[in-house]
Amino acid sequence: MTDIAFHITDLAANSLRAGADAIDIALSLDGTQLELAVTDNGCGMAPEAVRRAFDPFYTTRTTRRTGLGLPFLLQSAEGCGGSAAIRSVPGKGTCVRALFM
């Protein structure tokens, strides 16, 4: 459960850095499946950034970013049979979803 708390904090911090003034954090439990969705109205991500977002060490930031937050989210989700995905529209915002089985 500490991984989930880390992911929520990390995704919310990413949203704030992207200029979001509204962040929706949703957790839903369906039997043994937990879904985490973090949606913001920040600057969104370019298509190339979305494609590479789960690549270790990939970052669009130039200072103090390791590029490991989203790969860690994917690893955590896949480690228990789940998945992670990103939907983003430049200028409108981003939604990151992870399913933990």
Residue map of PLM features:
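Conserved ATP-binding N-box helix of the HATPase_c
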Residues: 1-26
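Short beta-strand-loop-beta element adjacent to the nucleotide/active-site pocket used for signaling
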Residues: 28-36
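Acidic ATP/Mg2+-coordinating residue in the GHKL
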Residues: 40
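Short conserved segment of the HATPase_c
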Residues: 45-56
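Glycine-rich ATP-lid/hinge loop adjacent to the conserved G-boxes
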Residues: 58-66
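Conserved glycine-/histidine-rich ATP-lid loop and adjacent helix of the Bergerat-fold HATPase_c
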Residues: 72-82
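A short beta-strand-to-loop motif within the catalytic HATPase_c
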Residues: 86-90
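Glycine-rich GHKL/ HATPase_c ATP-binding element in histidine kinases
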Residues: 92-94
